Curated annotation (Swiss-Prot):
Binds 1 zinc ion per subunit. Belongs to the MtfA family. Zn(2+) binds at H111, H148, H152, E211. Interacts with Mlc. Its EC number is 3.4.11.-. It comes from the Bacteria. InterPro entries: MetalloPept_cat_dom_sf, MtfA_enterob, MtfA_fam, MtfA_N. The lineage of its organism: Bacteria, Pseudomonadati, Pseudomonadota, Gammaproteobacteria, Enterobacterales. The keyword Transcription regulation does not apply. This is Mlc titration factor A. It comes from Yersinia enterocolitica serotype O:8 / biotype 1B (strain NCTC 13174 / 8081). PANTHER family: MTFA PEPTIDASE (PTHR30164), PROTEIN MTFA (PTHR30164:SF2).
Amino acid sequence: MIKWLWKANQPQAEMLAQWREALNIPLLAPLNEEEQQRLVSVASHLLQQKRLVPLQGVVLTPLMQARLTLLFALPVMELGAKWLDGFHEVLIYPSPFVVDDDWQDDAGLVHSGQTVQSGQSWEQGPIVLNWQDIQDSFDLSGFNLVIHEAAHKLDMRNGGHSNGVPPIAMRDVAAWEYDLHQAMDNIQDEIDMVGVDAASMDAYAASDPAECFAVLSEYFFSAPELLENRFPLVYRHFCTFYRQDPLARLKRWENESQNIESSSPMG
């Protein structure tokens, strides 16, 4: 078990200064000062509630702990840490890991064997991650293992199993399901046309609604322009559910960065 090395009851300004290095990753660059403070507040609560369990020689430094928890906190920054109270442990392998798995083929036959996994979210248990892919989740590439697994846990809050529909108002469920399935079909059509490797989005999103929600949540936070361009209705659903607009946040940050550059004296 990892014991958090920083205090959670510090003044916000002091706490933010200690988290500054942890916040310094491309994924979190668009957040303004107020948003960073909210994110750190949620992350601090999560660190008090979760056990980080390093496996197979993984050594978690305070900076690694902080960055991992900030990734968990991002999707619930406006919802609150309580939305991730469905698990108590995070198991961390050094790299993708081998598990015994059962799966069903297109003919309905069930197969058993070993598969390589990047992460898992158990319905009645922990989240399992690997540090190699956690590090690849720090940028704005559209890939984010931590957000993917956190999305599964949010999905499970709606009845205890993941089906692609997190807790939303009943009046919104039909439109959510329709638009999500339309996105799945669109992604599958693209895969059929150009192949998995040339597809513009992760083919895993077309496998089932639960994976579609998790994969598109990755794009929502780390490649919002792509998601909004491809599936604007899904993007708006996600804005309502997560209570965030990452694309607006990204554009604000880009404009501010351009203004700073244009006002800088020529060197």
